[in-house]
Amino acid sequence: MVIEKRESFIEVVINSLLNDNPAQAKFDKYSILVSLGFSSLLSVILLCIFTLLRTKFNTYDRCIPPMKKSLWGWIEPLWSIKVEDCLYNMGADAVISLLFSRFCRDVFLILAAICCTILIPINIVATNKTLANSDSQNAYAKLSIQNVTGNWTWAHVVICYVFNVLVLFLLARYYQIVMRIRQRYYRSPTYQQSMSSRSLLIMDIPTTMRSNNGLSILASRLKSSEAPMHVHICHAIKNLPKILKKHDNAVRSLEAVLAKFFKNPKKLPDDRPVRRVKQGLLTSEKVDAIDYYSAKIENYGLRVDAARESLYENEFEHYGFITYKSSYIAHDTARHNSRVAGASVSMAPEPSDFLWDNLSLAWSTRLFNRMIGNILFIILIIAWIIETALVAIFISNLYHLGSVWPWLQQQLTSRSGFWSIVQGILSPAVAGFTFMILEIIMRRISYWQGSFTKSSRERGVLNKLHIIFTLDNFIIYTLMAVFWRLGVIIAYKTKEEGNFAEGMSAFATFDTVGLSVSSFVQFSTFWIMFIAHSTCSFFVEIAQPITLTIRLIKTKFFSPTPRDLLEWTAPTKYVYSQVLNKLIYFFTIAICYACINPLVLLFASVLFCVNYLTQKYILMYVSNSSTESGGGYWRPVVNRILLGLELANIILFLCLWVQGGRVRAYCIIPNFSFAIAFKIWCMFALDPKSHYMIEDPYMKVVEPLENEISESEMCFGHPSTYAPLLVPMVRSDARALLPLFYSGRTETHNKFDFATDSDDASEKHLRGEEEPLENVDFVDIDNVDTAKEVHDQQQVQQLKKNLSRSYTRSRGVSLRARLNEEELPLTESITQDSQISIPETLESQSTEITPINVSEHYDKYYHIF
């Protein structure tokens, strides 16, 4: 019997790392093919599902622009309509987001054509001449710069200059387009008619000036061509938003109880619905659920009314608003005044864009939260390296996991086909799932740091996501295999020498830079799989299989409330930080591999083409902007594009340095100055014309007359001070049975025969002689589209009533002659939208309402996809 010494764990790992493994190269090849095949098949299936369901459920008469009823009728508007012409339909943020997607598409279509036709043949020829046994090499390695040395790399230097000039040239052209679009947005009727376009937000007002008279004195110190028309400093609202939220939760709870009880009005349950209420620490009793929630609704409603009536008895906040006659005067004043008397000055955002809780925070609190938030972000970056290491080392390359798991190593050898499928699907899926978690964490940190507006919070999320994606999920993710190899070698050396100090000596002889560059080049196969899977994800967004499945299950097996049904018909909210971060992430990956592995460019060009078409359809027919910042995302996006360009230059410089071409590496250095010079040019030539409205004698700015500005239009403050209270929604076929079970007040008129209140009714509301508001809103669940339209009209009418009441009017100081009471129009808009405007509160308290121009965008309410 012969006894053989068994290799130790460290020796097995060392052999697997240091020795070339032809099986692994074949395994990686099949993994890429499986990944591409799976992504292509799933994309085709999702596209077919979307095409079939769209023709069945779409409401064509309300689509703007209209679509044909054919299977592929949805593609024609995407080709025929220019993005620039959709400004008034989609908004500036949506247009600029699509322009950035189109910019990426143009860049990578041109780069893919250049690099694939020039660099790939050069790489193949150079690899065959460099390596005698090139036939045994990985086919993907032949397409890259991995084995290219000598004068062959001059082609990569030339291409580096080409893509730097190309990116900056196209970026300059798109920058000018964005500048013109933002100026068109500033001059649009929708923006001009909004109160916020003519107002300044004054933050951190000194204690001695926290009054309307003090704010008037502060306004007189501003460098402005004209005096302001109106100033208003806000009052503290204390616990009013919490009471309003409890009221809305009680309404939704009552709706859930009634929806379950009246699920089948022809066959009601024998017993009334009940719920358990705590009576003590350990005891509870059953009470009638309908009566319980009805009492809570009435109680919270009275508390909300009392809090609103006593609002102006509260102390003043440290922020206020100054309103001018025209938007140009407000922009010009904001341009020349950043601070005055210790207070900060900026353009007032839209009412729906405010984060009112953060607006009330003191300067010291915001500073402390910002500091703690940055510390937490740094800790998260470091902690996320562990997750990145596990995924990068073991999931993206199962042979690394097999080196420490003998059973898996045996399986990889015997069943390589099956495990290549697992690696091709699992690794990009796990990476995508971890990226989703990051976005949620970043948004919470940005909110806690004290962002004033939702758009600034989203820009903060974009900045943080870009840092952690580029650092952790791209650079460290790609180089983690090198760190793994270095750690194993140090452990092996320590065991062999019996001394950790001797083990660390291996670090001195370890070719860190060379192996890092080699790992970066070899990791291109993973990024090809990841880009292919991400392309498939865009078809998931447009087909919405998960959302439709969840809603189908809820509809068939549960009891959704009428409000749920109405909310499902509302357009979804488009999250720009998430979408733009993904595009920047893909741009950074693809541009870094432009000269290293041109095959990545081919897949990136397909990804951006698919993204442009799908996102254009979504923004035209499916989603709305949650808030409108007027294109404020463009400058952060450009900064990150320039950073990605510089990172690509650094990586190519290191590759050429490792390949022995020191002179060729030095030739890359001038490229670093191009992006810096471009940024300086943008700061002085383009940014001032983009951030503020500029005076143009050929474009007339709509300036409202003094007698066209009503007092109700001067309404600033937290939306909870004027938002209509929610009323319970019940299905219309339960109208006759409802009085038997519900003791609250109801209206007997048909909601589908909705009519606006007359002038006499409005006067009654002003005098306080209003009729009791209805406590129940009946909804025909068999005709949700019509019910949605009627309910929206009712909410708008109720909002106008609230704005006409005395406690919601601005009690600021008017710096012009007051109008007579008979001349005060009571139904002016207070938000950005013309004709029908709904503040952010309706969005937050009744999510089926969206702040859009209903006459132009109502098709989105009815469009299922």
Curated annotation (Swiss-Prot):
Keywords per UniProt: Calcium, Cell membrane, Glycoprotein, Ion channel, Ion transport, Membrane, Transmembrane, Transmembrane helix, Transport
Annotated glycosylation sites: 128, 147, 151, 624, 802, 853
Protein topology in the membrane: Multi-pass membrane protein
Cytoplasmic topological segments: 53-106, 173-374, 442-470, 533-582, 662-665
Transmembrane segments: 32-52, 107-127, 152-172, 375-395, 421-441, 471-491, 512-532, 583-603, 641-661, 666-686
Example of a GO MF term: calcium ion transmembrane transporter activity
GO cellular component: cell division site; cell tip; plasma membrane
Record topology, Extracellular segments: 1-31, 128-151, 396-420, 492-511, 604-640, 687-865
UniProt-listed InterPro entries: Csc1-like, CSC1/OSCA1-like_7TM, CSC1/OSCA1-like_cyt, Csc1/OSCA1-like_N
UniProt GO BP: calcium ion transmembrane transport
Subcellular location, record wording: Cell membrane
Function: Acts as an osmosensitive calcium-permeable cation channel.
PANTHER family cross-referenced by the UniProt entry: DOMAIN PROTEIN, PUTATIVE (AFU_ORTHOLOGUE AFUA_3G11660)-RELATED, PROBABLE MEMBRANE PROTEIN DUF221-RELATED
Family statement drawn from the similarity comment of this UniProt entry: Belongs to the CSC1 (TC 1.A.17) family.
UniProt protein name: Uncharacterized protein C354.08c
Protein species of origin: Schizosaccharomyces pombe (strain 972 / ATCC 24843)
Organismal lineage: Eukaryota, Fungi, Dikarya, Ascomycota, Taphrinomycotina
